[in-house]
Amino acid sequence: MNNILAIALGAAIGANLRYGIGLWAAQRFGTAWPYGTFIINLLGCLGIGLLLTLISTRLTLSEPVRLMLVTGLLGGFTTFSTFGYESFSLLSSGNWLPAIGYMVGSVVGGLIAVIIGVGLGRWFGG
């Protein structure tokens, strides 16, 4: 499979997953706080930690499949630009405490999710 097509396929899947989870989070938790982006970015951090650890320890994937999963799927799934805009929106509307909670929670939670993903990858990888 062509690398560009593999990335495009993964990105299409990741973007649609992001859209679906974003809709679900808005219906489930409301839109006063960016729950969808928060959940998506933490799941993406968990996923990249797990996947890259498994690839480096156990899984043998072709270059197109690795690109499809990491660059395409996870790249299309997570969204740093939305995180930046939602942080700005909370700050500019005077919601300082929710904004700080969102920013700190996203960065610290993302790092913790990567650590958990790496740990899971090592555990599954033997």
Swiss-Prot record:
InterPro entries with a match to the protein in the record: FluC (IPR003691)
Keyword Chloroplast included in the entry's annotation: no
Keyword Transmembrane among UniProt keywords: yes
Membrane topology of this protein: Multi-pass membrane protein
Catalytic activity line of the entry: fluoride(in) = fluoride(out)
BP terms from Gene Ontology: cellular detoxification of fluoride; fluoride transmembrane transport
Location within or outside the cell: Cell membrane
Coiled coil: none
Main location: membrane
Record GO terms (molecular function): fluoride channel activity; fluoride transmembrane transporter activity; metal ion binding
Keyword annotations of the record: Cell membrane, Ion channel, Ion transport, Membrane, Metal-binding, Sodium, Transmembrane, Transmembrane helix, Transport
CC terms in the record's Gene Ontology section: plasma membrane
Taxonomic superkingdom: Bacteria
Entry similarity comment: Belongs to the fluoride channel Fluc/FEX (TC 1.A.43) family.
Biological function: Fluoride-specific ion channel. Important for reducing fluoride concentration in the cell, thus reducing its toxicity.
PANTHER family recorded: FLUORIDE EXPORT PROTEIN 1-RELATED
Name of the protein this chain belongs to: Fluoride-specific ion channel FluC
Species this protein is from: Chloroflexus aurantiacus (strain ATCC 29366 / DSM 635 / J-10-fl)
Lineage, opening ranks: Bacteria, Bacillati, Chloroflexota, Chloroflexia, Chloroflexales
GN (gene name): fluC
